[in-house]
Protein backbone atom coordinates (compact mmCIF):
# COMPACT_ATOMS: atom_id res chain seq x y z
CA UNK A 1 0.00 0.00 0.00
CA UNK A 2 2.89 2.36 0.77
CA UNK A 3 4.17 2.05 -2.80
CA UNK A 4 0.72 2.93 -4.16
CA UNK A 5 0.49 5.95 -1.84
CA UNK A 6 3.91 7.07 -3.09
CA UNK A 7 2.66 6.80 -6.68
CA UNK A 8 -0.42 8.87 -5.86
CA UNK A 9 1.75 11.49 -4.22
CA UNK A 10 4.08 11.54 -7.22
CA UNK A 11 1.17 11.98 -9.62
CA UNK A 12 -0.08 14.94 -7.57
CA UNK A 13 3.33 16.62 -7.25
CA UNK A 14 4.33 16.00 -10.87
CA UNK A 15 2.27 18.82 -12.43
CA UNK A 16 3.43 21.28 -9.75
CA UNK A 17 7.04 20.30 -10.34
CA UNK A 18 6.88 20.77 -14.09
CA UNK A 19 4.92 24.01 -13.70
CA UNK A 20 7.80 25.25 -11.53
CA UNK A 21 10.27 24.18 -14.24
CA UNK A 22 8.35 26.14 -16.88
CA UNK A 23 8.30 29.21 -14.61
CA UNK A 24 12.04 28.95 -13.97
CA UNK A 25 12.81 28.71 -17.68
CA UNK A 26 10.55 31.64 -18.54
CA UNK A 27 11.78 33.88 -15.74
CA UNK A 28 15.47 33.26 -16.48
CA UNK A 29 15.28 33.20 -20.28
CA UNK A 30 17.94 35.49 -21.86
CA UNK A 31 15.30 37.13 -24.05
CA UNK A 32 12.98 37.95 -21.15
CA UNK A 33 13.11 41.74 -20.58
CA UNK A 34 11.93 41.26 -16.99
CA UNK A 35 14.62 38.68 -16.09
CA UNK A 36 16.77 41.20 -14.20
CA UNK A 37 13.96 43.03 -12.43
CA UNK A 38 14.26 43.05 -8.62
CA UNK A 39 13.00 39.79 -7.16
CA UNK A 40 12.72 37.95 -10.49
CA UNK A 41 16.06 36.05 -10.14
CA UNK A 42 14.88 34.83 -6.72
CA UNK A 43 11.60 33.66 -8.20
CA UNK A 44 13.43 31.84 -10.99
CA UNK A 45 15.89 30.20 -8.59
CA UNK A 46 13.13 29.21 -6.20
CA UNK A 47 11.07 27.67 -8.97
CA UNK A 48 14.00 25.61 -10.24
CA UNK A 49 14.70 24.38 -6.73
CA UNK A 50 11.05 23.34 -6.33
CA UNK A 51 11.22 21.56 -9.68
CA UNK A 52 14.35 19.61 -8.79
CA UNK A 53 13.06 18.63 -5.36
CA UNK A 54 9.80 17.32 -6.77
CA UNK A 55 10.66 15.87 -10.18
CA UNK A 56 10.88 12.17 -11.04
CA UNK A 57 14.48 11.19 -11.76
CA UNK A 58 14.80 8.74 -14.63
CA UNK A 59 17.75 6.41 -15.10
CA UNK A 60 20.63 8.48 -16.55
CA UNK A 61 22.55 7.41 -19.63
CA UNK A 62 26.22 6.49 -19.45
CA UNK A 63 26.67 9.03 -22.22
CA UNK A 64 30.23 7.95 -23.02
CA UNK A 65 30.58 8.64 -26.74
CA UNK A 66 34.14 9.93 -26.77
CA UNK A 67 37.06 8.93 -24.56
CA UNK A 68 40.83 9.01 -24.43
CA UNK A 69 42.94 5.92 -25.10
CA UNK A 70 46.71 5.83 -25.43
CA UNK A 71 46.80 9.64 -25.62
CA UNK A 72 44.37 9.71 -28.55
CA UNK A 73 40.72 10.70 -28.73
CA UNK A 74 38.60 7.69 -29.65
CA UNK A 75 34.93 7.02 -30.36
CA UNK A 76 32.93 4.78 -28.02
CA UNK A 77 29.76 2.83 -28.75
CA UNK A 78 27.77 1.23 -25.94
CA UNK A 79 26.51 -2.25 -26.83
CA UNK A 80 24.53 -4.97 -25.06
CA UNK A 81 26.77 -8.05 -25.08
CA UNK A 82 24.35 -10.29 -23.17
CA UNK A 83 20.82 -9.69 -21.91
CA UNK A 84 19.21 -11.38 -18.94
CA UNK A 85 15.88 -10.50 -17.26
CA UNK A 86 17.51 -8.68 -14.33
CA UNK A 87 20.73 -7.44 -15.93
CA UNK A 88 22.33 -6.38 -19.18
CA UNK A 89 26.01 -7.05 -19.75
CA UNK A 90 27.22 -3.97 -21.62
CA UNK A 91 30.40 -3.41 -23.55
CA UNK A 92 31.92 -0.05 -24.38
CA UNK A 93 33.41 -0.72 -27.81
CA UNK A 94 36.26 1.62 -28.75
CA UNK A 95 36.97 2.85 -32.29
CA UNK A 96 39.82 4.81 -33.82
CA UNK A 97 41.05 5.67 -37.31
CA UNK A 98 44.68 5.78 -36.14
CA UNK A 99 46.46 2.46 -36.98
CA UNK A 100 48.93 2.73 -34.09
CA UNK A 101 46.13 3.36 -31.59
CA UNK A 102 44.09 0.47 -33.00
CA UNK A 103 47.03 -1.89 -32.55
CA UNK A 104 47.55 -0.76 -28.96
CA UNK A 105 43.85 -1.14 -28.16
CA UNK A 106 43.84 -4.67 -29.56
CA UNK A 107 46.39 -5.67 -26.94
CA UNK A 108 44.65 -3.96 -24.02
CA UNK A 109 43.42 -6.13 -21.12
CA UNK A 110 39.74 -7.01 -20.89
CA UNK A 111 37.95 -5.78 -17.76
CA UNK A 112 34.52 -6.64 -16.36
CA UNK A 113 33.23 -4.06 -13.88
CA UNK A 114 30.61 -5.63 -11.63
CA UNK A 115 28.40 -2.78 -10.43
CA UNK A 116 26.37 -2.87 -7.21
CA UNK A 117 22.71 -3.79 -7.15
CA UNK A 118 22.12 -1.53 -4.19
CA UNK A 119 19.83 1.34 -5.04
CA UNK A 120 21.69 3.41 -7.60
CA UNK A 121 22.06 2.56 -11.26
CA UNK A 122 25.32 1.32 -12.75
CA UNK A 123 25.74 4.78 -14.29
CA UNK A 124 27.07 5.82 -10.87
CA UNK A 125 30.28 4.17 -12.14
CA UNK A 126 30.44 6.36 -15.25
CA UNK A 127 33.74 7.91 -14.16
CA UNK A 128 35.11 4.45 -13.39
CA UNK A 129 34.28 3.25 -16.90
CA UNK A 130 35.52 6.36 -18.68
CA UNK A 131 38.86 6.16 -16.89
CA UNK A 132 39.28 2.42 -17.51
CA UNK A 133 38.70 2.96 -21.24
CA UNK A 134 42.11 4.65 -21.45
CA UNK A 135 43.88 1.30 -21.25
CA UNK A 136 41.25 -1.46 -21.26
CA UNK A 137 38.41 -3.14 -23.11
CA UNK A 138 35.52 -2.55 -20.71
CA UNK A 139 32.33 -4.45 -19.85
CA UNK A 140 29.90 -3.58 -17.05
CA UNK A 141 26.87 -5.16 -15.40
CA UNK A 142 23.88 -2.84 -15.84
CA UNK A 143 21.22 -4.06 -13.39
CA UNK A 144 17.57 -3.65 -14.35
CA UNK A 145 15.10 -1.80 -12.12
CA UNK A 146 13.07 -4.64 -10.57
CA UNK A 147 9.79 -2.79 -11.08
CA UNK A 148 10.41 -3.09 -14.82
CA UNK A 149 10.84 -6.90 -14.74
CA UNK A 150 7.55 -8.81 -15.19
CA UNK A 151 6.65 -11.07 -12.28
CA UNK A 152 6.54 -13.96 -14.76
CA UNK A 153 10.36 -13.86 -14.86
CA UNK A 154 10.41 -15.24 -11.32
CA UNK A 155 12.36 -14.15 -8.27
CA UNK A 156 15.98 -13.02 -8.08
CA UNK A 157 18.14 -13.75 -5.05
CA UNK A 158 21.79 -13.62 -4.05
CA UNK A 159 22.37 -17.09 -5.52
CA UNK A 160 21.00 -15.81 -8.84
CA UNK A 161 23.40 -12.86 -8.71
CA UNK A 162 26.29 -15.30 -8.28
CA UNK A 163 25.03 -17.35 -11.25
CA UNK A 164 24.75 -14.21 -13.40
CA UNK A 165 28.37 -13.27 -12.62
CA UNK A 166 29.53 -16.77 -13.54
CA UNK A 167 27.64 -16.59 -16.85
CA UNK A 168 29.09 -13.18 -17.69
CA UNK A 169 32.64 -14.35 -16.94
CA UNK A 170 32.18 -17.40 -19.18
CA UNK A 171 30.63 -15.28 -21.94
CA UNK A 172 33.57 -12.88 -22.04
CA UNK A 173 36.19 -15.59 -21.45
CA UNK A 174 37.82 -16.04 -18.05
CA UNK A 175 41.34 -16.75 -19.32
CA UNK A 176 41.90 -13.19 -20.54
CA UNK A 177 39.58 -11.38 -18.14
CA UNK A 178 40.15 -9.12 -15.14
CA UNK A 179 37.19 -8.52 -12.82
CA UNK A 180 36.68 -5.34 -10.81
CA UNK A 181 33.91 -5.43 -8.20
CA UNK A 182 32.80 -2.25 -6.48
CA UNK A 183 31.26 -2.36 -3.00
CA UNK A 184 28.39 -4.83 -2.52
CA UNK A 185 29.25 -7.21 -5.42
CA UNK A 186 32.64 -8.08 -3.94
CA UNK A 187 30.79 -10.82 -2.04
CA UNK A 188 28.95 -12.52 -4.94
CA UNK A 189 31.96 -12.07 -7.23
CA UNK A 190 34.23 -13.85 -4.76
CA UNK A 191 31.61 -16.58 -4.46
CA UNK A 192 31.29 -16.95 -8.24
CA UNK A 193 35.03 -17.24 -8.82
CA UNK A 194 35.40 -19.61 -5.85
CA UNK A 195 32.76 -21.95 -7.27
CA UNK A 196 34.30 -21.83 -10.74
CA UNK A 197 37.73 -22.63 -9.31
CA UNK A 198 36.37 -25.52 -7.24
CA UNK A 199 34.83 -27.04 -10.38
CA UNK A 200 38.09 -26.75 -12.27
CA UNK A 201 36.84 -24.00 -14.59
CA UNK A 202 39.16 -21.22 -15.79
CA UNK A 203 39.10 -18.19 -13.50
CA UNK A 204 39.86 -14.52 -14.26
CA UNK A 205 43.47 -13.38 -14.43
CA UNK A 206 42.87 -10.97 -11.56
CA UNK A 207 40.24 -9.85 -9.08
CA UNK A 208 40.15 -6.24 -7.88
CA UNK A 209 37.80 -5.74 -4.94
CA UNK A 210 36.99 -2.20 -3.86
CA UNK A 211 35.24 -1.14 -0.66
CA UNK A 212 33.14 -4.27 -0.16
CA UNK A 213 31.73 -6.14 2.86
CA UNK A 214 33.68 -9.40 2.59
CA UNK A 215 33.67 -9.57 6.40
CA UNK A 216 31.34 -6.93 7.93
CA UNK A 217 32.40 -7.98 11.42
CA UNK A 218 35.56 -5.93 10.96
CA UNK A 219 35.21 -2.21 11.75
CA UNK A 220 31.40 -2.26 11.52
CA UNK A 221 29.80 0.94 10.23
CA UNK A 222 26.34 2.37 10.80
CA UNK A 223 25.18 0.44 7.72
CA UNK A 224 26.45 -2.82 9.22
CA UNK A 225 24.94 -2.03 12.61
CA UNK A 226 21.52 -1.34 11.10
CA UNK A 227 21.51 -4.82 9.58
CA UNK A 228 22.35 -6.50 12.89
CA UNK A 229 20.17 -4.41 15.21
CA UNK A 230 16.93 -5.64 13.65
CA UNK A 231 15.77 -9.21 12.93
CA UNK A 232 15.15 -10.25 9.33
CA UNK A 233 11.41 -10.15 10.02
CA UNK A 234 11.67 -6.41 10.68
CA UNK A 235 13.09 -5.81 7.20
CA UNK A 236 10.42 -8.01 5.64
CA UNK A 237 7.66 -6.11 7.41
CA UNK A 238 8.97 -2.57 7.01
CA UNK A 239 10.85 -2.14 3.73
CA UNK A 240 9.43 -4.78 1.38
CA UNK A 241 6.50 -3.63 -0.76
CA UNK A 242 4.63 -4.68 -3.89
CA UNK A 243 5.08 -2.95 -7.24
CA UNK A 244 1.81 -1.17 -8.19
CA UNK A 245 -0.15 -1.93 -11.38
CA UNK A 246 1.30 0.89 -13.50
CA UNK A 247 4.68 -0.86 -13.96
CA UNK A 248 5.63 -4.00 -15.93
CA UNK A 249 6.72 -5.65 -12.67
CA UNK A 250 3.32 -5.23 -11.03
CA UNK A 251 2.87 -7.65 -8.17
CA UNK A 252 6.61 -8.19 -7.68
CA UNK A 253 7.95 -7.75 -4.14
CA UNK A 254 10.76 -5.19 -3.99
CA UNK A 255 12.73 -2.92 -1.74
CA UNK A 256 11.54 0.34 -3.39
CA UNK A 257 14.01 2.87 -4.66
CA UNK A 258 12.19 5.75 -2.96
CA UNK A 259 12.74 4.13 0.45
CA UNK A 260 16.40 3.55 -0.34
CA UNK A 261 16.74 7.18 -1.40
CA UNK A 262 15.19 8.30 1.89
CA UNK A 263 17.80 6.20 3.66
CA UNK A 264 20.63 7.75 1.65
CA UNK A 265 19.43 11.26 2.56
CA UNK A 266 18.95 10.33 6.22
CA UNK A 267 22.62 9.37 6.49
CA UNK A 268 23.72 12.98 5.83
CA UNK A 269 20.66 15.28 5.90
CA UNK A 270 22.61 18.40 6.79
CA UNK A 271 24.99 17.94 3.88
CA UNK A 272 22.12 17.65 1.39
CA UNK A 273 20.26 20.66 2.79
CA UNK A 274 23.45 22.70 2.55
CA UNK A 275 24.01 21.52 -1.02
CA UNK A 276 20.52 22.62 -2.11
CA UNK A 277 20.95 26.00 -0.43
CA UNK A 278 24.29 26.46 -2.19
CA UNK A 279 22.58 25.57 -5.48
CA UNK A 280 19.97 28.28 -4.86
CA UNK A 281 22.74 30.81 -4.14
CA UNK A 282 24.65 29.76 -7.26
CA UNK A 283 21.55 30.46 -9.36
CA UNK A 284 21.18 33.91 -7.79
CA UNK A 285 24.84 34.72 -8.49
CA UNK A 286 24.62 33.40 -12.02
CA UNK A 287 27.31 30.80 -11.28
CA UNK A 288 26.20 28.36 -13.97
CA UNK A 289 29.26 26.12 -13.68
CA UNK A 290 28.64 25.22 -10.03
CA UNK A 291 24.87 25.06 -10.61
CA UNK A 292 25.37 22.59 -13.46
CA UNK A 293 27.70 20.47 -11.31
CA UNK A 294 24.91 20.29 -8.71
CA UNK A 295 22.38 19.26 -11.36
CA UNK A 296 24.61 16.50 -12.71
CA UNK A 297 25.37 15.11 -9.26
CA UNK A 298 21.75 14.97 -8.13
CA UNK A 299 20.49 13.72 -11.49
CA UNK A 300 22.60 10.64 -10.70
CA UNK A 301 22.16 10.54 -6.93
CA UNK A 302 18.37 10.87 -7.03
CA UNK A 303 17.92 8.25 -9.76
CA UNK A 304 17.29 5.02 -7.86
CA UNK A 305 16.00 1.57 -8.72
CA UNK A 306 13.90 -1.02 -6.93
CA UNK A 307 15.80 -4.06 -5.68
CA UNK A 308 14.25 -7.55 -5.84
CA UNK A 309 13.01 -8.39 -2.34
CA UNK A 310 14.61 -11.80 -2.25
CA UNK A 311 18.01 -10.42 -3.22
CA UNK A 312 17.84 -7.68 -0.60
CA UNK A 313 16.74 -10.03 2.19
CA UNK A 314 19.35 -12.63 1.19
CA UNK A 315 22.04 -9.96 1.40
CA UNK A 316 20.88 -8.78 4.82
CA UNK A 317 20.68 -12.31 6.19
CA UNK A 318 23.66 -14.06 4.60
CA UNK A 319 26.14 -11.19 4.35
CA UNK A 320 25.37 -8.84 7.24
CA UNK A 321 23.68 -11.02 9.86
CA UNK A 322 25.08 -14.53 9.50
CA UNK A 323 28.46 -13.63 7.92
CA UNK A 324 28.35 -16.89 5.98
CA UNK A 325 31.23 -16.10 3.60
CA UNK A 326 33.97 -15.37 6.16
CA UNK A 327 32.71 -18.20 8.38
CA UNK A 328 33.00 -20.68 5.52
CA UNK A 329 29.33 -21.66 5.74
CA UNK A 330 27.86 -20.26 2.54
CA UNK A 331 26.22 -22.67 0.12
CA UNK A 332 25.09 -21.44 -3.30
CA UNK A 333 22.63 -23.77 -5.05
CA UNK A 334 23.93 -26.61 -2.91
CA UNK A 335 27.65 -25.90 -3.52
CA UNK A 336 29.88 -24.72 -0.68
CA UNK A 337 31.72 -21.47 -1.38
CA UNK A 338 35.43 -21.97 -0.64
CA UNK A 339 37.67 -19.04 -1.65
CA UNK A 340 40.62 -21.27 -0.79
CA UNK A 341 39.95 -23.04 -4.09
CA UNK A 342 41.14 -19.96 -6.02
CA UNK A 343 44.76 -20.44 -7.05
CA UNK A 344 45.39 -18.81 -10.42
CA UNK A 345 43.68 -15.43 -10.02
CA UNK A 346 45.67 -12.52 -8.61
CA UNK A 347 43.94 -10.48 -5.89
CA UNK A 348 43.98 -6.72 -5.25
CA UNK A 349 41.87 -5.20 -2.48
CA UNK A 350 41.32 -1.46 -2.10
CA UNK A 351 39.79 0.39 0.85
CA UNK A 352 39.13 4.04 1.56
CA UNK A 353 40.61 5.37 4.78
CA UNK A 354 37.40 7.31 5.54
CA UNK A 355 34.88 4.83 4.12
CA UNK A 356 31.72 5.05 6.25
CA UNK A 357 29.91 2.26 4.38
CA UNK A 358 32.47 -0.57 4.26
CA UNK A 359 34.85 -0.15 7.19
CA UNK A 360 38.60 -0.71 7.13
CA UNK A 361 39.53 -4.37 7.03
CA UNK A 362 36.25 -5.61 5.57
CA UNK A 363 37.59 -5.92 2.02
CA UNK A 364 41.08 -6.87 3.14
CA UNK A 365 39.52 -9.97 4.71
CA UNK A 366 39.47 -11.51 1.22
CA UNK A 367 43.20 -12.21 1.60
CA UNK A 368 42.60 -14.42 4.61
CA UNK A 369 39.92 -16.35 2.74
CA UNK A 370 41.90 -16.73 -0.51
CA UNK A 371 44.63 -18.68 1.25
CA UNK A 372 45.80 -20.55 -1.86
CA UNK A 373 46.76 -17.42 -3.81
CA UNK A 374 50.54 -16.89 -3.39
CA UNK A 375 51.58 -13.74 -1.55
CA UNK A 376 53.38 -12.45 -4.66
CA UNK A 377 50.03 -12.44 -6.47
CA UNK A 378 48.20 -10.45 -3.80
CA UNK A 379 48.18 -6.77 -2.83
CA UNK A 380 46.20 -4.49 -0.52
CA UNK A 381 45.89 -0.72 -0.68
CA UNK A 382 44.35 1.81 1.72
CA UNK A 383 43.69 5.14 0.00
CA UNK A 384 44.41 8.00 2.38
CA UNK A 385 41.68 10.61 2.70
CA UNK A 386 39.25 8.65 0.51
CA UNK A 387 35.67 7.95 1.45
CA UNK A 388 33.51 5.25 -0.07
CA UNK A 389 32.83 6.97 -3.40
CA UNK A 390 36.34 8.40 -3.68
CA UNK A 391 37.90 5.02 -4.40
CA UNK A 392 35.99 4.62 -7.67
CA UNK A 393 34.97 8.12 -8.76
CA UNK A 394 36.42 11.61 -8.85
CA UNK A 395 39.91 13.05 -8.82
CA UNK A 396 41.29 10.67 -6.19
CA UNK A 397 40.11 7.68 -8.22
CA UNK A 398 41.61 9.02 -11.44
CA UNK A 399 44.92 10.21 -10.03
CA UNK A 400 45.64 7.82 -7.14
CA UNK A 401 43.57 4.65 -7.34
CA UNK A 402 43.37 4.04 -11.07
CA UNK A 403 47.14 3.97 -11.74
CA UNK A 404 47.49 1.24 -9.11
CA UNK A 405 44.60 -0.78 -10.55
CA UNK A 406 45.97 -0.38 -14.09
CA UNK A 407 49.47 -1.46 -13.09
CA UNK A 408 48.19 -4.47 -11.15
CA UNK A 409 46.11 -5.63 -14.10
CA UNK A 410 49.03 -5.17 -16.50
CA UNK A 411 51.30 -7.13 -14.18
CA UNK A 412 49.10 -10.21 -14.34
CA UNK A 413 47.78 -9.82 -17.88
CA UNK A 414 50.92 -10.91 -19.72
CA UNK A 415 50.63 -14.67 -19.04
CA UNK A 416 47.22 -14.61 -20.72
CA UNK A 417 48.69 -12.87 -23.77
CA UNK A 418 51.48 -15.44 -23.96
CA UNK A 419 49.01 -18.32 -23.70
CA UNK A 420 46.89 -16.79 -26.44
CA UNK A 421 49.97 -16.53 -28.68
CA UNK A 422 50.75 -20.21 -28.13
CA UNK A 423 47.17 -21.16 -29.06
CA UNK A 424 47.32 -19.10 -32.27
CA UNK A 425 50.79 -20.09 -33.52
CA UNK A 426 51.72 -23.24 -31.67
CA UNK A 427 55.04 -21.63 -30.67
CA UNK A 428 56.03 -20.30 -27.29
CA UNK A 429 57.39 -16.73 -27.28
CA UNK A 430 61.16 -16.39 -27.08
CA UNK A 431 62.59 -15.79 -23.63
CA UNK A 432 63.54 -12.22 -22.89
Model-identified regions with their sequence ranges:
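Conserved acidic catalytic loop of the alpha/beta-hydrolase fold
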Residues: 148-150, 160-177, 189-194
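Short, surface-exposed "cap/lid" segments of acyl-processing enzymes
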Residues: 63-149
Amino acid sequence: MLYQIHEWQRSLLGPLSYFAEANARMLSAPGNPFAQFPGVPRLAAGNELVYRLGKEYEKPEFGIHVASAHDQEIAVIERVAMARPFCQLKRFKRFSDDPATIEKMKNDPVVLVVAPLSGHHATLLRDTVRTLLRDHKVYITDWVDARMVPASEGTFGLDDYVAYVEDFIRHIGAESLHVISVCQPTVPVLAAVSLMAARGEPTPRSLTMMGGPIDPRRSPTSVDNLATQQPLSWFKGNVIHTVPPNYPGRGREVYPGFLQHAGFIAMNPGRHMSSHWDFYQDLLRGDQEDAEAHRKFYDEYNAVLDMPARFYLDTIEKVFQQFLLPRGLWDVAGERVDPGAIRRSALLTIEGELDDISGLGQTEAAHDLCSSIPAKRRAHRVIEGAGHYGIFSGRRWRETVYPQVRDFIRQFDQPAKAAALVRRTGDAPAAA
